Amino acid sequence: MRVGILISGFGSNMIKLIESCEKENTRASINIVISNNPNAKGLEYAKSKGIRVHSIDHKLFKDRKNFDEAVNEILTNNNIDFICNAGFMRIHGEDFVKNWFNKHLNIHPALLPSFKGLNTHQRAIDQGVKFSGCTVHMVRSGVDEGPIISQAVTSVDSDDNAKLLSARILNLEHRLYPLCLQLFAEDLVSIAQDKVIYTEKALEVLREFKI
């Protein structure tokens, strides 16, 4: 499975996805990294790994549709099968989402459907929730919406601040996202009518992750 990653910055989740695809016996390969930010540091890392990179400055396009079309053209020309957002700070238009329907993952640093959007950690603390975490989900046209593939959970402690909570959740992201990508690469999960279908092997892998 040929994978493209979309980033806007450093792309720490991108790094973990690349590392997971460098292991033996994986059916996924990272074949291109695209950023809407020409100065994204993640581009240099991907390039150092021999991965093709592209920067497409969204500010040079008159609207979202034209930008999406440019991204889609690059993905298509590189025979990409599947996309992962890794800190990609742009909202996709409906046409782009349809083109990559059920072939496009995102990770969000909260337990969806709670705390969609930005500033998730401080909002979770302010609301007094006792648990937070991260969510891997299929991309849909709504912000941080789509079928949930898996979630990882951590406690929100009484002395937490946004920085401390963010660090713990980022550690979970770095483990969960590569795992979910590999589940799709190995055909262990699928989507039917917006419901996630798990094989017994997928359930076993996810249970082991949560232990």
Describe each region flagged by the PLM.
Residues 1-41, 45:
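N-terminal Rossmann-like dinucleotide-binding module
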Residues 54-59, 107:
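Short beta->alpha connector loops at strand-helix junctions that form conserved
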Residues 15, 193-211:
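Short, basic/aromatic-enriched C-terminal tail that caps enzymatic domains
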Residues 35-36, 60, 64-65, 78-94:
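N-terminal glycine-rich "phosphate-gripper" loop used for MgATP/nucleotide binding
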Residues 69-78:
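Short, well-structured alpha-helical segments in soluble
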Residues 7, 64, 68, 166-170, ...:
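Amphipathic, non-transmembrane alpha-helical scaffold segments
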Residues 20, 82-198:
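Donor/substrate-binding cores of folate-linked one-carbon enzymes
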Residues 49-50, 100:
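Short, structured coil segments at secondary-structure junctions
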